[in-house]
Amino acid sequence: MKNFLYFFIFSMLFASCDIVVDLDIPEHERVLVVNSILTTDSMINASISHSVGAFDASSISYVNNATVEVYEDGVLLGEMNEEVSFSYNYMDELDSTYVYNFNQNPVAGKIYSYEIAHPDYEAVRAETTVPAAVKLNVNDVTLLSEQDDEKHYRVRFSFNDAPEDNFYRLRFRYQNEYYDGFNDFESNDASMISSAGVQSDGATFYGDEALFDDEMFNGTEKEISIDFFVYNKPLEYTLELTSVSESYYTYIRSLRAHYDNQDQFIFAGEPVQVFTNIENGLGVLGSMSVDTMLLELP
């Protein structure tokens, strides 16, 4: 009898763990998602899609037949032209991508805004000020060590930061007729390390793209040293310093934090709100201007 009582109690405990909860999830109201990064060396363009709910099984689809008005300093320049391209997705299904183009390059210092309307969605608006390119000065390139086919270099460069809030992206490109990409580099520069979210002393930034602000050197000449390794290949190496808008800087940082958060177990990390400057929608309208310097490696 005693054993039967224990068995009955344990059976009830396990049975009570199987609970089905019906969640009353409100239907997701789709909004326009706009992604557009203006660069002074390319014509104005944007991709437009729509949002999906967290529990929505449907895929993200690009939106066609939208009216996209482009303004420069508040003056209407005209409407974007819609272009469609077809490709096959990972399920071997024919998919279409709609891109909106405007045949004009943006100008540094100008404010560009979009007003976008579509009969199925709430109208959205966004604007960005295109930053001016900052001249890059390479002070020296030093060969630190050489072993077999590997060479360790250090490049020291500088630029003059304007006395206002500025945001930068640093990349190091390699290329020849067969290869084209961005090389990893490392630096112990405090601005890069702080902007990457690392606060510990003695830390080193490592990656192929550094985003940083001018909080530590506003309005002064800034000098940075980076280390990198090259191998015995006939490649050209170019240092690339890009002035980016605050909207682009904030969006990319929040997007990285969102992706990093996905690597954790469910509910283990704090949710990350991805930045947007699209009124009544999602996505980003950002801008940038770039200066480059071809390196002569000793």
Where are the regions a protein language model picked out?
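Sec-dependent signal peptide recognition
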Residues: 2-7
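C-terminal motif of bacterial Sec signal peptides marking the signal peptidase cleavage site
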Residues: 13-16
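A sequence/structural signal for flexible, mid-protein segments enriched
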Residues: 18-298
